[in-house]
Amino acid sequence: MTFQNKKILVAGLGGTGISMIAYLRKNGAEVAAYDAELKPERVSQIGKMFDGLVFYTGRLKDALSNGFDILALSPGISERQPDIEAFKRNGGRVLGDIELLADIVNRRGDKVIAITGSNGKTTVTSLVGYLCIKCGLDTVIAGNIGAPVLEAELQREGKKADVWVLELSSFQLENTESLRPTAATVLNISEDHLDRYDDLLDYAHTKAKIFRGDGVQVLNADDAFCRAMKRAGREVKWFSLEYEADFWLERETGRLKQGNEDLIATQDIPLQGLHNATNVMAAVALCEAVGLPREALLEHVKTFQGLPHRVEKIGEKNGVVFIDDSKGTNVGATAAAIAGLQNPLFVILGGMGKGQDFTPLRDALAGKAKGVFLIGVDAPQIRRDLDGCDLNMTDCATLEEAVQKAYAQAEAGDIVLLSPACASFDMFKGYAHRSEVFIGAFKAL
């Protein structure tokens, strides 16, 4: 796929949209940016990142009338709207960042493990990524978890990966046609996003697009929608809590089995709960499909506590717990981290915002955060977006200062959470370096 001199409109200016602008401009496209609502400070912020970028706002129809060849959609924008359907009828092409990545990995030959489902996909993606890393593969974990895929690709500067582990939402799959995963799963289907789809079957059909190509299908035998996704002539691995399948739970003994072969006791799996038994079965099946050895996979399952720098407890001092989520580089990841923690929180936010809107954090922080500490170049924007939501916000010149001030205010039972919702490159070499500084500041208390 060539973009040289193509006129492309990128719609939606969150993290995914920003990554598409960066990738497409690097590859010679004439790119413009669109968002239905654009504040002047947002235009200024993004304009500093991309010299000469043209912005459109208001009606998408008006923006599309300027002779664009391609519309690159962020996942939050449905292509099922009249303006976009008319654009396609008139010969325009619509795609998203996953389709752009598919073109890259198809040409380069990277293996891909793709994961979707109504529930459990983040856990399975994290576990699969962890297992691949522990087995020595050069692994990229991206998509609906962590960094947008093109941001991850740009950071790698074109270097081939052993495997991409992608969490994909139905929104991301809508305009993805060329992805051919080495192995893929739909974990389950339940009612979700029905404000965007005609009905549950329409939603399931969108999820099933993950199975294009001839890769291994990993399917939930207990879910009627998933059973219907089996494709003729394809290798299929079934997992089940109810039946004897390729991977199944022997309830009498509490052990996971592969056919007649004993695999692992559920009590040896750090992830608690019956639903996580299905997640482990799916993860092992996916990893075996890219050639990883079963014995090693099962040993590493026993040590899985979550990805490094992703909601990871690093220590405790005088009853105050410190949690590192430096890999939380976008608003969605930070909101999820906050939602998963029950104790009162002091949250450290900030860095390079990548043009994101931080207002969704207002609801996430409400009733849970006792204070917010702001660092980095986009701290002023975060303060503006959170203004008026009854939060005590403190500006800090360094991450070390934020850690010290958070600890000074915290009481036993509180949590100090680093989950910046931002990229790190304004102050650090990367999210891992940011994590190192956070850990160092904790140890220095």
Swiss-Prot record:
Coiled coil: none annotated. InterPro entries: Mur-like_cat_sf, Mur_ligase_C, Mur_ligase_C_dom_sf, Mur_ligase_cen, MurD. It is found in: Cytoplasm. GO terms for biological process: cell division; cell wall organization; peptidoglycan biosynthetic process; regulation of cell shape. One of its GO terms (cellular component) is cytoplasm. Its EC number is 6.3.2.9. It is an enzyme of class 6 (ligase). Keywords: ATP-binding, Cell cycle, Cell division, Cell shape, Cell wall biogenesis/degradation, Cytoplasm, Ligase, Nucleotide-binding, Peptidoglycan synthesis. It catalyses: UDP-N-acetyl-alpha-D-muramoyl-L-alanine + D-glutamate + ATP = UDP-N-acetyl-alpha-D-muramoyl-L-alanyl-D-glutamate + ADP + phosphate + H(+). Belongs to the MurCDEF family. This is UDP-N-acetylmuramoylalanine--D-glutamate ligase. It comes from Neisseria meningitidis serogroup A / serotype 4A (strain DSM 15465 / Z2491).
